[in-house]
Every structure is written in structure tokens, then in C-alpha cells.
Amino acid sequence: MSDSKELVVVDGGMGSIVACAAARARTLSMGSDGHGPTPVWLDRGRLLSDAPGFDRLFESLAVETLEQHPDPDLDRRDDQPASLTLLTATLGAADHGIAHVVWPIHAGVDGRPSEMDLELAARHVDTALLVTRLVALDSERHRCASIRVDTPYADFSDRQLAELALDLGTPFRMAPWWNDSSSEEYRRWRGVFEAIGCVAAG
């Protein structure tokens, strides 16, 4: 089992970009013991663009996609419950001996950069705790009893997440949606960066 590695659940949004950058920073801080790419689990149903469009971004973030065995009936459904995706990703992490899963979801409110939805944040945390317990119950099979799911940005507003993205020097401009001015994700985050006075947002 790898105690140092972490798996990041990725949908291609700002939260997952920040989480991958943060994981990379932690890896580099470990020196020779922390070499190697960060494993990620693609949330294909919610991926904000076709996966190949993220190749340059993923290369910049030094991540690798964990081998997944997609269910053709579920894997690309955008109505698949987030809890089911998280459960599948956490089981995948355990099967690969990875004991730490990062679910970079946040409770920001679209159009109100400084606000967050407290009730939604609490649901995200509860979901992570329940998935952790469910997967731990299956530890006799995967031998990863210490598995845990963290939600480091659950109570972040859009503004806080954007500021962290800047602090970490994340390459969010390489995301396909950032180069598509018609996308909802671009509209949302362009507005956030403008609100915090980031003149280099474009």
C-alpha cells in the first residue's frame, strides 16, 4: 500500500485542477521519495470536455489516469450520482493500494464569488465520510483498511478557490473550457478572476 500517494477525482473543473497542482506540490516537497505522477480518476460523466483535450493540462500537472474499467451504461452519464462516482473511484484507489482520495468538490455559488452554500458543503463532507466507511468495510478484499476520502475545498467559495489557484500557479488557462468563451465554466471563472482583480485572467 502507498501511504504517500493520493488519488484525485478529476472532472476537469477548477477544483480538480487546483487539487492536482496541490498534490504535485506535496510530491515535490517529498524529494526523492515523492517522485512520480499523481494518479487521477476521471469522472467521465461530468468531464467538462473530451478527455483528449486535457492532455496538455495533465502533462503540465504531472498526472496519470488510473486504469479504469468503464461501465458503458454509466460511465458517461451526466446524471450519475456524484456519490456513486466517488465510491467507484475510492474502490479503484483501494484496489491499487492508494489509501488517500481527494474529492475536490466545493460549494461556491455561481455568480456570487464570495459566497458558499453551507448546506451543500455539509452534504459533500457527509458523502465523503460515508464512502470512506463503506470502502473500509471491504478491506478484507482490498487490504486497504486505512482508506480515507478528503474534501479539502468543501467549504470554499469561488473566490477562495480562484485565489488558491493563483497562489499555486495552476495552469488553468490550459483547460479546454478556458479557451471556449461560450462555455459555462469559462463564464463563471472569468467573472471570478475579474472580481478579484486578476488582470491576467484572459
Question: Language-model segments: what does each one mean?
Answer:
Residues 1-171:
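ATP-dependent adenylation/nucleotidyltransferase module used to activate substrates
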